[in-house]
Amino acid sequence: MEPIWSELQLERMAGRTAAQAFVEGDIPMPAGREVERILQADAQIQNETARCADGRVDVDGTLALQLLCVSTDGIPFDVHASTRYNHTIPVEGAQEGMRAEITPQLMDIRTALDNSNRAHVEAVADMNATVQQDENMRVITDVRNARNLETRYEQAQLARVRPLTGVSLRSREELEAPGVVQVLRVNAAPHIDNVTLEANGAAVEGVMYLYALYLDDEHRLMQAMVRTPFSELIPLEMDVSACSRITAMPSVRDISGNVTTEGEALELNITTQIEVFCITREDVNTLSDAYSADGGVNVERQMVEQLTPVSTVTGLCRIMETLRVPEESPDVARVIFTTARPTVLALTDNSGQLAADGILVTAVVYADAQGNTNVFEEDIPFRCAIDAPFSPDAMVRVRPLEVRGSGVGRSVQVEYLLETQARLFERQQIMLAVDMQETEPAQRENGIYVYMADEGETPWDVGKRYGVTMEQLQEWNPDLGEMFAEGTPVLILSNSGRRR
């Protein structure tokens, strides 16, 4: 008997959990500015490092803030700042040297001014952690020169997310901004609609959603928005023949805005990073179990659990809501701008399809009839359908591309355009044979038996226990199924093994 060995490169899932992190910091206001109030706070959280240790993952990152303030002389201005955080996430099974992926999600943010002209910021974030171990495992794939050996095999699907390339794109866009004198805030949200593989690279098509907040020549707070399509052919120097799916992930690395020399418009300079990935797949047949009729073989087996990447699905979700102005607030004369921060609370099985349920934390900044700037917030429940089958192991992110508000009086109509991105995984458990040894034949009684099977037992279980081949078991029990019900009679003629 000669086992055939092979080495599998596995990504084993060691643990997965979620924890909440509290982030706080003090943000000094610009020198020479006396702040009357903070109108609106926006933030983005980005985890930068994750280090695995025994039973935990240590993470740190940055909370980037944009605070829209009003000075004591009634002039709006924007403050950009950041604060660092570090946190420890308990993860059972984590060990030093393993790899952790952290997906942070901002749940709540609060700001307050103190007497020293500083803003105290408190934020709560969900930290979703997945810990995996890259392991080369030596396994048995088959057996040579074995007599009367029954073997069973499993197909292991080895899939990996493989980075192909990354490119940095610079673009310049112009937004109409009548009467603009000062730029306060600029944001860009790139969305990729389509990625196709061509002979000389990956063709990427999408839309850039641009937004700017500025002051006009009457010191009024104004907003400008535009959508700009883009396309790019990204060269790929690596072999992509093994790729089953190609995905492109965009992110804004830098953005700045200036008033054009002619006035009446804003010039935005954007640097966008696009990372191109693919999923490679390899199906490997491995030995999962074996036995000999005389019981003279011992197989050591090990169960391995993998979280196998399947695909990344990106889509759009459009929502329209009517928001009511709180009783204590004045009527709306003009909506200045509207923001939304999506928070995903649960993944839902929507008739077999994946859906994300959550809250849109919405802020409406508006001017009243006297020209004063006001703000109110409301939490809007949402559900976004995703073009993918339901999977409890999916990692879903929802982000706003564009939020538009309009209306006067006591209500505001808000149109949300959200991007959904679902990374789909398949939880795979593989039984692998990691060792095999010949042993003394088992002692068995000659005779005829009728075995009453337990619920869920298989012919393999019975054959291995009593030392009979699958062919013999089928011959004696012509109506044998793949799995037994409780009390199913199985006829066995035991005539192998070492006799008593």
Located regions from the model:
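Primarily a LysM-type cell-wall glycan-binding module
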Residues: 438-475, 480-500
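Membrane-lipid interaction segments
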Residues: 1-445
